[in-house]
Amino acid sequence: ERHRQEELRLIRELRLQSARKLLSPHLLFNAINAVAPKDSTVSEHLVNIARFSVQMLDKNMVSLGDELQLSREYVSLHRAMHDDDPEVEWDLDPSAQSAASVPTLCIQTHVENALKYAGASHITVAVKRASAAIEISVKDDGAGYLNTVSAPGQGMGKGIQTMSRTIAVLNDGRMNKMKYDILSVAGKPGTEVRIIIPDEDKGNNNR
């Protein structure tokens, strides 16, 4: 139990590092410069992202609604700052969103990867209920995960490693294990991330 708590503490620190990157001075400088010429709502998106980050990053599991809202804010900010932003489609099953809990940043991480590294023209975020579980998919038509990861622990690979570690540690406290898969074929375009989150068993506490 002591080892597991230490793992959870380290994962929280990794999430905080991700938040620092998300709200880095470089991003803030670019965002501020984007406000005047485009008359955009960049500042509003930045404030919302900061607010969600403060509320969420100290938690291991958050509501699906909050995770989706953070991801939408990130997409909106990215779109306001880039002219060549890919289309992002949200395919959300309303029955999957009531009272569901998901690992923190489990959608935002992969949306960010698709926007920043994949070079995709289309991204689909899908959430549905299947039996006694929530199924999440983030799919893009970009270069492909196996073709874009240049070195372990950097860029897209670092975010995926952190999420994989997070889910592995959280699974130690669950009777019904979460599943996390990256579907990518070397030399072929496109990546799909699939996360299956069974309904929580009684007595489980990963927060």
Predicted regions and their residues:
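A short beta-strand-to-loop micro-motif at the C-terminal edge of the catalytic HATPase_c
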Residues: 179-190
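Short, charged, solvent-exposed linker or helix-capping segments at domain edges/interfaces
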Residues: 148, 204-207
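Two-component histidine kinase transmitter core
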Residues: 198-203
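Hydrophobic core positions in the C-terminal catalytic ATP-binding module
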Residues: 190-197
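Two-component histidine phosphotransfer core
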Residues: 1-180
